[in-house]
Structure formats: structure tokens, C-alpha cells
Amino acid sequence: MKSDIHPKYTEVTVVCANCGNSFETRSTRPSIKVDVCSNCHPFYTGKQTLVDTAGRVDRFNKRFAKSTASQAQAK
């Protein structure tokens, strides 16, 4: 087998650009910068907010309510 064909696998520091958190891992890259980590991601922190805009189900329910109301008046 050939020797020295694989990149060096070393200890690197991962730094979060959002909160500044850093931790150690191993990689072939010299350093890793991430946008969001588990310390500041809304899913992991429990600060997740759901943005509920009128979706297709809500639109259907509104139309269905109107049609049942108009059918009840027609009888």
C-alpha cells in the first residue's frame, strides 16, 4: 500500500459564529467555523417559536366552514 496518501487527522477547534461557543473535535481541516451550534440553536435551547401563517389547511377549513354554513341556510 502507498504511504502518506491520506490527509493528517488532527485535533481542531470548532467555533460558533453566532454565540462564540467553541469545542474540540478531530478533522482533516485546520479549523471549523459554524453558523449555529447546539448552544444557540432554537430547537435545542427550547426557545423555538412557530410561525403559523395561514397555511393550506387553514384555508381549506375556512372554505369548508363557509360551504357548510351556506348549505345549512339553504335547507
UniProtKB/Swiss-Prot annotation:
Chain segments annotated as transmembrane: none
A Gene Ontology molecular function term of the record: structural constituent of ribosome
PROSITE patterns to which the protein is assigned, alphabetical: RIBOSOMAL_L31 (PS01143)
Record's keyword annotation contains Isomerase: no
GO CC, any one term: ribosome
Family label: Belongs to the bacterial ribosomal protein bL31 family. Type A subfamily.
Name of the molecule in the record: Large ribosomal subunit protein bL31
